[in-house]
């Protein structure tokens, strides 16, 4: 997670340093801010993973949308649900506009594949489970509290449905914004986000939704 967070932050910082606008002096060194933001994101990550997100279950989708809207708004984003037969997509836009700058649209998805609990090597596929490899190279469960302790082993892994595909990247994106704010940095490009609710079903309706909201989603890069 930290490697991707570093990439996201450095991309924004590089753009910010090349931008014409000036920023307030950083209040914390960037490496420390990135580490702090990554660590602070773990409780939210665990919370989001606890929400079932079966792509065919409209109630699952609505619960995830509610959580995600609150999380993006907490970072100052403006959000809007895009209607999609009871399983809306979520659009978010950072309101700070940079005159003359490019606009980047980030695509992620929050739905997941159906779960067969008996096929999982843990009690609950929706409960974040911390694991490490034992002497035989097998994954074994350890206390999740370790994730919130003073020392986190980079070789540990969090197992749960959609932990890497694709809820992890969403939480990393939010943590990257937290790190930027902690250093008084702002992206020098305009930021839009589209969160798909049906990627695991082949995104069968995203074309229709995108066409209906062409101007809202307009960007220079995806």
Show which residues each predicted segment covers.
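Positively charged n-region of N-terminal signal peptides that target proteins for export
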Residues: 1-4
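Acidic/histidine-rich catalytic neighborhood of metal-dependent amide-processing enzymes
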Residues: 151-222
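Alpha-helical transmembrane segments and their juxtamembrane interfaces
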Residues: 12-13, 74, 206
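A ubiquitous, low-specificity "background" feature that marks scattered single residues
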Residues: 8-9, 117, 171, 202
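Boundary at the C-terminal end of the N-terminal hydrophobic targeting segment
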Residues: 16-22
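Bacterial N-terminal signal peptides
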Residues: 6-16
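Acidic/His- and Gly-rich active-site-bordering loop/insert found
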Residues: 22-163, 170, 180-189
